[in-house]
Amino acid sequence: MTMHITNLYGAWGTHVLAQQNVAKVARELGFTEMGLYFYPVDSDTGGELRKRLDGITSAVGNGDLVIFQSPSWNALSYDKALLEVIRAHRVKLAIFIHDVITMMFEGAPEEIYPSLIEIYNMADLLIVPSEPMLEFLKEKGLAVGKVLIQPMWDLPFSGELRVPEFQRRIFFSGSLQRFQAISSWNYEIPLRLFGYDEFKGKNPNVHFEGWKNTTELLIEYSKGGFGLIWEQTARPEYYRCNQPHKLCTYLAAGIPVLIQKGLVHERTVREYGLGFVVDSFEEAADMVRNISEEEYYQLVNNIKNISFLIREGFFTKKLLIDTVNYLLLG
């Protein structure tokens, strides 16, 4: 029996990096990569698509185990057709949900959900980002019996990082189009922004520093400060049931976080002393303004162990091993 996992190519962004990080950890556990390419699916005829899918699945044999990282960011019809070809091999199939596209973007038609749930219901096991996401999908018709909840994103990183220094400043990385509330920052605590969107604000304490890759971000974060995690502007409810990639990046760098109340991992941050849960930007700024150096370094010390786990990929390793055990042993 061979274990397979899909991996996405031909696109860029955090969503692609997440799939590639999972596939990297999976390869270390003995999985074979099944490469998918992001492309205009409508350019294929039915016959061309079938040839493409046959090529992608050529290494899959009867009785194998397959983990499909969802979505492929191609059309839903592509995902369904691919899974139908995979299922024809009588495999054990797990679908690892990274994002639910219909929940992410404002104006996404509700009539898409039946097609999406039909795809999810093809799985023998489903990996979901959170309990709230699972309950939402069940309301839409999800019927998969075997489910695992993803604990947290990993960020595999083998480089050396400094111990963060005590700094009264806040970091935020992301699209200012998606997180428009960030533009209203009006406090004396410095806010350092990283992303593609150009920022033109009036507050001299907001510093826009452009896009940086993962390694560059980790180096900047590890110089000291706090990482901010906030809901997106459109469809904010999505951020309340989805895994925030920002969290693992901040923690991998060893810095405390400021997470908006109600988001996934609010409880984790509280219980493990990884930072603060806040209701508003004003409260976040107050926390940074009033914390002592001793209190800051206590938070940094609290983060050491979970930072190690994230950089070594342990959360993903355990999740993948649990997936294999659950599929094969029940």
Predicted regions, residues:
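A short, glycine/small-residue-rich beta-strand->loop->alpha-helix junction that serves as a flexible
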Residues: 6-20, 44, 72-75
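Short amphipathic alpha-helix
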Residues: 16-29, 246
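Extended catalytic core of nucleotide-activated donor transferases of GT-like folds
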Residues: 43-135
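Donor nucleotide-sugar binding/catalytic pocket of nucleotide-sugar-dependent glycosyltransferases
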Residues: 124-138, 142-159
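Conserved catalytic-core segment of nucleotide-activated headgroup transferases in glycan assembly
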Residues: 153-220
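Nucleotide-sugar-dependent
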Residues: 215-253, 259-267
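A short acidic/histidine/glycine-rich donor-binding loop in glycosyltransferase catalytic cores
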Residues: 271-278
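A charged, aromatic-enriched C-terminal amphipathic alpha-helix characteristic of glycosyltransferases
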Residues: 279-282, 286, 293-329
